[in-house]
Amino acid sequence: MGCRGQNCSEKRRAIRDHFIVISDSEGEEEKEVIRFGKNIAQPDGRRTSVKRKIAQMTEEEQLALAVRMSEQEANHVNYSQEEEDELLRKAIEESLHSCTVSEPCNTTTQQNTNTLHSTNRTLAAEDCSEKHPISQNCSLSEPPNNITVQQVYKETLSTNEPVKLQEHAEEKSFSQVSALFELPSGAAEQQMNKEAHSTERPVVTGDVVEEGHLSQTFTVSETPLSATQEMNTEDFTTSATFVTEEVGEALTQYSTVSSQSRHKSPVVLLMRLSQDIVESSSVILSPKCRDPFSDMESGMASSCPSNSSNFVSMLPHKALTLSPVFPKQLPRRLGLSPRKLFQGASLTSDSKEQEVDDQCSHCSESSELDYSVLPNSLQAEPFKSNTATEVLKENNTLLNGVTTEEQTGASNSCLDSQRQSGSTVHYYWGVPFCPKGEDPNLYTQVILCQLEVYEKSLKKAQRQLLRKMNFGEPVQLSAPPLRRTERGKADSQDSLSQESEDLKDEDSPRPVDDEEVDSEKPMNQCVSSSSRQPAESLEEESPIPAQDEQDNNSQLILFLNMNNSHSTSLPL
């Protein structure tokens, strides 16, 4: 306990030395230091408690806790990424807004300064200039500057708070009206009231200046106005009846600038192409034929104001080589039967072969149809049925200014000439088509000759590969396997040992000296070795059956035993 108290006092002293508090009373210093120490001790205690809980938890609970922690981290990361994406989108929208608004505003502000100077000069000299009156049917409500800004806002910034932008534009328009036209107080108030009651802003429908007479038509809102207000508008128009030629020139300049700014506005209209343009894109134009897109422009101008019609109208004299688009056809099965490999007199062809011919002629890229490229077996028979000719006319509308009727006439003439000559060309699978300007018959003959040469060279190479093997040395029969000889030796030894034991038992035992025994051992060894050597030589020289070998061995053993018995019985 004493050690723990000393450690706590040392920690408190270190905390006091680290954090110096300047105050009037000593008690406040101690309280603040103690509070800070408690705040430090609290997170340490929490950590230890959390560690204890984790240690007490089972493995499954720990896994569940780890999964929860990972999910929380993933959600936090996803949320931060979403926030960053939103900030990027906002920044991009603001930059686009600044770019789109700055261009038309710069052009309009420069023009507004010119119009202000011109109108101030002209309105000051109203009494002197009475030559160019304005038609009373018009009502000068606003300059067209605000109209262009409003249109740009409606087209480009429809997603970025359009209501606030329109209100801002309206405030600008009111200030510009008051600056442009120095009107009497009553007329100005009436005009402001009229614009406040209206729900829609006036839109310019046409700007025309002819010989100083300014004729503008404005479409005012459809809200009903009282008779007093209409009279007030008439008074307003009569009060500002005279404008000089300078105002007309300024307005014409502004109309040109506003039209240029409208073309420059970055508005992209994604329109879907009509079926007519898609089908006509396969047509290749030439200077001889009529432009088929001229009739199309009148219909497309009202329905879809896309950029494709402008692109086509800009290039009426150039040959448009667009990507080929195949016309709609019924699903057909192509007959992929192999061609005849010999030149026959039959010139008949099926309808399926005619369909293949039609497709080949439609996909040709040359300026004129080259019928020498196509196989004559397909071109041999003329078109008998009317349906086939109709399909040809529908598929091949225009091809370099030459219609299908002329092409069919040319093909018929070619067929007649081929019939007169009597030569037919048969293309084979794998043989390329004849190039332009060469005789197809000679071309096929050359290729067939090349194929023959290739086959002959292959045969020669194969003959060289197939070589006969020379006969080797004759195979001699080998001696009988060693296993049989080893087994025979083992059997002979066993039989010898058994017979020798039997013979010893039968004979009566006699006392024999040690010297006799010693003399008998080398004799027996010599006899056994001599008996084994001829037996082995006999076995190696001629293969004998197992039974014969056993009989011979038994006879030899008996003979040797008899000799041994006689030698032992003889006295020394």
Swiss-Prot record:
Its main location: nucleus. It is found in: Nucleus. Coiled coil: none annotated. Pfam families: RAP80_UIM (PF18282). GO terms for cellular component: BRCA1-A complex; nucleus. Keywords: Chromatin regulator, DNA damage, DNA repair, Nucleus, Repeat. Gene3D superfamilies: 6.10.250.1800. GO terms for molecular function: histone binding; K63-linked polyubiquitin modification-dependent protein binding. Residues 476-572 are annotated as: Disordered. Component of the BRCA1-A complex. Ubiquitin-binding protein that specifically recognizes and binds 'Lys-63'-linked ubiquitin. Plays a central role in the BRCA1-A complex by specifically binding 'Lys-63'-linked ubiquitinated histones H2A and H2AX at DNA lesions sites, leading to target the brca1-bard1 heterodimer to sites of DNA damage at double-strand breaks (DSBs). The BRCA1-A complex also possesses deubiquitinase activity that specifically removes 'Lys-63'-linked ubiquitin on histones H2A and H2AX. Also weakly binds monoubiquitin but with much less affinity than 'Lys-63'-linked ubiquitin. PANTHER family: BRCA1-A COMPLEX SUBUNIT RAP80 (PTHR15932:SF2), UBIQUITIN INTERACTION MOTIF-CONTAINING PROTEIN 1 (PTHR15932). This is BRCA1-A complex subunit RAP80. It comes from Xenopus tropicalis (Western clawed frog). The lineage of its organism: Eukaryota, Metazoa, Chordata, Craniata, Vertebrata.
